[in-house]
Swiss-Prot record:
GO cellular component, as recorded: cytoplasm
UniProt protein name: Chaperonin GroEL
Alphabetically ordered keywords of this record: ATP-binding, Chaperone, Cytoplasm, Isomerase, Nucleotide-binding
GO molecular function, one term: unfolded protein binding
Main location, first listed in the record: cytoplasm
Species the sequence originates in: Streptococcus pneumoniae (strain P1031)
Name of the coding gene: groEL
Length: 540
């Protein structure tokens, strides 16, 4: 395929047009009075959303050069979403502002490399000032405030703060669709995995069809148990202790399963068998997690261990285990807290180094199960369109809340970015680096201007007053009042503001220093074949 190439100002101008088209579409959603954008879907009803990254991903422009500019801004939104989970619209607005001011100066003859150095220095100073202004998020009320601001719903804020209180900041909080109209929270404490009992005759409550084991021993193995003789010595030892047993194995079949069921029915001892969770290497890792959580050992050939040689010392223990037909929950495992903490640290490091989104998701699930539990927010709505929009808002709120707990909070509504202007303005730079610094100074005002504009106010008047206000005092665009943003619960996580600014500056600098753009030349549309005269028959 032949290529089309544009150079210097032509190349940059085409990309900037794409940046503006995407940013102008996304920025109308910013702030409490932000509007929605309707996205056409190939199948089903249109999606109505105010989620910046969702909108950015949908935009595809016909002109290849403009499309590259749009895609670079979309990358800013995606990267910010990956790191902080929110702030995608702010990142888009900042990118457009830096590119717009930068292009003016490059066109006027400024050195793009000098501008880039100035931008990088200014952003580093702004980030440092943001961190210095941060307030730690320590209590349930503060968490609820962050979630409520992001989701625009106090009820959602309460659900998320309650979920984080129950399962901890590393716990898994999943968002599912409810069968009803109401949104509700469901919390499963302890480690849960998706494997149920192998026989319904193992239940202890025939009405609820669940097996409850109090203070059980837990046999953990990646082997298949077919011959009861393999575990007979172990069963005899457990029988003397008069405690129930949970067997987690690759499978239990052959004569072993009916023998266990028969002894359960006769009341000889209480036993429940389940299949090991996961597959392949992930199964081995999950079994090791369970062993560390319960203080047991995985009986596996990898360690040279055989079932017939297993003793009670190799078994895990827990305060309670509940098993139904689909899942198993282990509560209060008896594992060594230091060993659990070390395992958590290992999984965290794997999350940071993995490049696979699927692997990262599975590692986060394992981390949460070791850390304390799983919370499920079941989203209810009247229509499918409303349900999709609500799920996106709750996902944003959850991500923003995690970010707030991690790095603290600052005043919201774009106020925090405006508050760091003095720290950037005092930087002593020379040459075109000064121009780069001034570009960042102007960009830091842009989120406040856009939020005010979307709410029907004049942005320049708001920013002028904000520059002279005390730290933390800002403009509440929802009411049109000047308030203490922190006291009013109008807050942003530092991680969100920081990531938005850093990612915006990074991509904007790349666009400013671009000197040539190579794109695929559009394929000419082939003319329709001429009609065969013989096919025209009596038409002549």
């Amino acid at each position: 395929m032949s290529k089309e190439i544009k150079f210097s100002s032509d190349a940059r101008s085409a990309m900037v047009r794409g940046v503006d088209i995407l940013a102008d579409t996304v920025k109308v959603t910013l702030g409490p009075k932000g509007r929605n954008v309707v996205l056409e879907k190939s199948f089903g009803s249109p999606l109505i959303t105010n989620d910046g990254v969702t909108i950015a991903k949908e935009i595809e422009l016909e002109d290849h050069f403009e499309n590259m500019g749009a895609k670079l801004v979309s990358e800013v939104a995606s990267k910010t979403n990956d790191i902080a989970g929110d702030g995608t619209t702010t990142a888009t607005v900042l990118t457009q502002a830096i590119v717009r001011e930068g292009i003016k100066n490059v066109t006027a003859g400024a050195n793009p490399i000098g501008i880039r150095r100035g931008i990088e220095t200014a952003v580093a100073a702004a980030v440092e000032a943001l961190k210095n202004n941060a307030i730690p998020v320590a209590n349930k009320e503060a968490i609820a405030q962050v979630a409520a601001v992001s989701s625009r719903s106090e009820k959602v804020g309460e659900y998320i703060s309650e979920a984080m209180e129950k399962v901890g900041k590393d716990g898994v909080i999943t968002i599912e669709e409810s069968r009803g109209m109401e949104t509700e929270l469901e919390v499963v404490e302890g480690m849960q995995f998706d494997r149920g009992y192998l026989s319904q005759y193992m239940v202890t409550d025939s009405e609820k069809m669940v097996a409850d084991l109090e203070n059980p021993y837990i046999l953990i193995t990646d082997k298949k148990i077919s011959n009861i003789q393999e575990i007979l010595p172990l069963l005899e030892s457990i029988l003397q202790s008069n405690r129930p047993l949970l067997i987690i194995a690759d499978d239990v079949d052959g004569e072993a399963l009916p023998t266990l069921v028969l002894n359960k029915i006769r009341g000889t001892f209480n036993v429940v068998a389940v299949k090991a969770p996961g597959f392949g290497d992930r199964r081995k890792a999950m079994l090791e997690d369970i062993a560390i959580l319960t203080g047991g050992t995985v009986i596996t050939e990898d360690l040279g261990l055989e079932l017939k040689d297993a003793t009670i010392e190799a078994l895990g223990q827990a305060a309670r285990v509940t098993v139904d037909k689909d899942s198993t929950v282990i509560v209060e495992g008896a594992g060594n807290p230091e060993a659990i903490s070390h395992r958590v640290a290992v999984i965290k490091s794997q999350i940071e180094t993995t490049t696979s989104e699927f692997d990262r998701e599975k590692l986060q699930e394992r981390l949460a199960k070791l850390s304390g539990g799983v919370a499920v927010i079941k989203v209810g709505a009247a229509t499918e369109t409303e349900l999709k929009e609500m799920k996106l808002r709750i996902e944003d709120a959850l991500n923003a809340t995690r970010a707030a707990v991690e790095e603290g909070i600052v005043a919201g509504g774009g106020t925090a970015l405006a508050n760091v202007i003095p720290a950037v303005a005092t930087l002593e730079l020379t040459g075109d680096e000064v121009t780069g610094r001034n570009i960042v100074l102007r960009a830091l005002e842009e989120p406040v201007r856009q939020i005010a504009h979307n709410a029907g106010f004049e942005g320049s008047i708001v920013i002028d007053r904000l520059k002279n206000a005390e730290l933390g005092i800002g403009f509440n665009a929802a009411t049109g009042e000047w308030v203490n943003m922190i006291d009013q619960g109008i807050i942003d996580p530092v991680k969100v503001s920081r990531s938005a600014l850093q990612n915006a500056a990074s991509v904007a600098s790349l666009i400013l220093t671009t000197e040539a753009v190579v794109a695929n030349k559009p394929e000419p549309v082939a003319p329709a074949p001429a009609m065969d005269p013989s096919m025209m028959g009596g038409m002549m």
